[in-house]
UniProtKB/Swiss-Prot annotation:
GO molecular function: fluoride channel activity; metal ion binding
Family of the protein in this entry: Belongs to the fluoride channel Fluc/FEX (TC 1.A.43) family.
Principal location listed in the UniProt entry: membrane
Regulation: Na(+) is not transported, but it plays an essential structural role and its presence is essential for fluoride channel function.
Annotated localization: Cell inner membrane
One GO CC term, this protein: plasma membrane
Keyword Nucleus: no
Identification of the protein by name: Fluoride-specific ion channel FluC
Membrane-spanning intervals of the chain: 5-25, 34-54, 59-79, 97-117
Gene Ontology BP, a term: cellular detoxification of fluoride
Task performed by this protein: Fluoride-specific ion channel. Important for reducing fluoride concentration in the cell, thus reducing its toxicity.
Organism taxonomic ancestry: Bacteria, Pseudomonadati, Pseudomonadota, Betaproteobacteria, Neisseriales
Keyword tags: Cell inner membrane, Cell membrane, Ion channel, Ion transport, Membrane, Metal-binding, Sodium, Transmembrane, Transmembrane helix, Transport
Sites where the protein binds Na(+): 69, 72
Length: 119
């Protein structure tokens, strides 16, 4: 059990830190939602690559469940979308939904293709 908790915890700490740093790196002129969008897109691409290339269970726990689970954020995406709707910005909310969903699906597919190519 502990042999699973350690890589999971390390990955989660690194993923949460990466998401926080990514949000700090987004210029103030851009939407606050942009940092989470980049995090979700990065995670979508990486999960495709990792799913194709990582076979060891401990590395899957560290990188996929821990790191990518903490890097990507459905709760942040949900809050951003609802906040846009509450701010009477339905077009921005729809754009946010489309960009997160379509972009993440496309990048996961691309990641799977990249992972299969380098395997």
């Amino acid at each position: 059990m502990l042999s699973n908790i350690i890589p999971l915890s390390i990955g989660a700490a690194l993923g949460a830190t990466a998401r926080w740093l990514l949000n700090l790196a987004v210029p103030a002129a851009m939407s606050p939602a942009t940092g989470n969008l980049f995090a979700n897109w990065t995670g979508a691409l990486l999960i495709g690559i990792f799913a194709e290339t990582i076979n060891h269970p401990q590395w899957k726990l560290l990188l996929i469940t821990g790191f990518l689970g903490s890097l990507t954020t459905l709760s942040g995406f949900s809050l951003e979308t609802v906040t846009l709707l509450q701010s009477n910005r339905p077009a921005s909310a729809l754009a946010n939904i489309f960009l997160h969903t379509a972009g993440s699906l496309l990048l996961t597919w691309l990641g799977l293709k990249i992972g299969a190519a380098v395997k």
